[in-house]
Amino acid sequence: MKLVTFNIRCDFGQDGENCFCRRRDLITAKIRREQPDIICFQEVLPHVAVWLKENLKGYYVIGCGRDVNLEDEQVSVAYRRDRVNLISMDTFWLSDEPYVPGSRYACQSICPRVCTGAVFSYSGGPGKAYLFRLYNIHLDHMGGEARRLGLELILKRADRESAFQNIPVILAGDFNAEPDSPELAVLKSRREFTNVTEGIGCT
């Protein structure tokens, strides 16, 4: 199975030559070349989510906006229709009230942070189906404490999941943190997790 994480960058008008309208064809061309089974996107605005659904042929796209009206940025997950089946999906906010839309930690920026969680079945061939749990996140860009709390919330939820226990867990996204940061020490302390990006450098 091939999984990629992709901060698509918000469609800001001030980006000039690097605006989304100039990057769209490059994005679809890159995805066609790589042919990933799962794509974890970050910074997906509502109109970009529509564009992804219309232009990622052969993929389904799931996710929901982070603000109180379920709009604004989302952390979308795209998965191949021919190899991956969605078993269950959950959207929650990184906050003390995970199911209150738009909620956030007091120690973070003004931006709510949302997580797209899902259980998938991946077809590795005839008679070979593998279940796994995926969390796609975009941690706060300002508050290290908020990043730590967000990671701890996700790990606790993964530990408590009653359905489909003992299946592999994948945590992907934009962590907004350096490898040696205190917040990522939360993950390093969990020996059951492997950092598959180690050694590839910054992107």
Annotate the PLM regions:
Residues R33-Q35, Y122-A129, R160-I167:
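Glycine-rich phosphate-binding loop signature in dinucleotide/nucleotide-binding domains
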Residues I38-Y135, L139:
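Structured beta-strand-rich core segments of catalytic domains in phosphoester-bond hydrolases
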Residues K2, Y60, P168-I170:
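Proline-centered loop/turn at the N-terminus of a beta-strand
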